[in-house]
């Protein structure tokens, strides 16, 4: 009888272990736009223990606004941005609890953008936050907190195979290798190329008094108290921080300030002193003001690094051989940052000159018309590039041009739906262009993935041969004299950050 019981226990234990592993494979790796939560969380666990001077927690505002790498570059301070999409305050608390098992930061920054939100996050967002965590008592408590607030079940978190069983037909090599060599080095941060300026009406309302009398929710305040207690227990100072966001108001600021005053917590609101770090709503945001792009990120990061240097006196570890991986990763970051320049150019003439650099392969595809609004100086640049006269003088027609290393290697135009498909270097390019009466479209695929903005005018997709990825996708509406730019956001979360 005893042997049967032991055999039964062993069977179910083995079954659970196998099912858990299969379940892990079935968990979606999530798209880059969702924030790569698995890669970034696994990277946290891969860090050498007790090497972080500071930790940054919160939702997407935290990891898009601050990168530990420019902080390291300028100050030799180590930090990690440990957050995930739409993270609620109760989940952030358990992230802090998890972090203190592996790191001993002296300061903990909590990004307050979603701290006051009482409504639970959606199912997908909760999964992105909880699935990547190692199984532990902390994770179990976090799951119980979330399932207690939603219709999600405990079993579906403990055995994700129950939730994702339909993914069998979708599995790829990445599902079996996630968490191995992820090629990610951003220390928790993500960078976005490209600028989408904030709207004028939103700028007018930014940090204004809406007349609301806001009070921080009592149920969320309980988690603030738990965070304070947790940080004190682990010898860390808790600091509230609010990174730039165009929808933040004076009333929201006052709500957090009142809470900070009540708890005796330092509160840094970047929305109250934009001139001190040079915030520019034209160039520093990737999505019209909700999140920072790489330009805004560097400004916010540098200010935070200076703050830590001034108030905490952290040792500059840039010459310390124990931190060689930081040096190597910071060099990679700097290279990518410098190459981001193209994604912030708003002028057509400057853009046409930029894409002629040796490192780029660029594809031009016209939708509807790209001729009627061309200025004379732009026409001269196009002629010097070797662009067909028909693009310059042919209204409502289609055009496809391939530029590699500054040279036109192929082009076609005409009053018909145009299609071009060839391999250029190591990438496969498929392009389609249709004038007003011939499809009215512009499509560019790089290795099968669509990148074109598909807007009226001249659509340009730029591939960087050194970084081995698309770094920008824009359209200039040259069908009228304004030449207005539209940019399709490129989130470079994949292999770089």
Where are these regions (language model features)?
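Membrane-embedded segments
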Residues: 57, 61-143
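Acidic-and-aromatic substrate-binding clefts and catalytic sites of carbohydrate-active enzymes
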Residues: 86-90, 215-218, 244-252, 371
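N-terminal Sec-pathway targeting helices
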Residues: 1-14
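Active-site segments of SGNH/GDSL-like serine hydrolases
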Residues: 225-249
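Short acidic-hydrophobic catalytic motif
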Residues: 338-361, 365-497
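C-terminal regions of proteins
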Residues: 254-323
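Membrane/wall-proximal cationic-aromatic binding patches
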Residues: 12-78, 88-98
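Secreted/periplasmic serine-hydrolase-like ester/acetyl group-modifying domain
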Residues: 126-234, 317-337
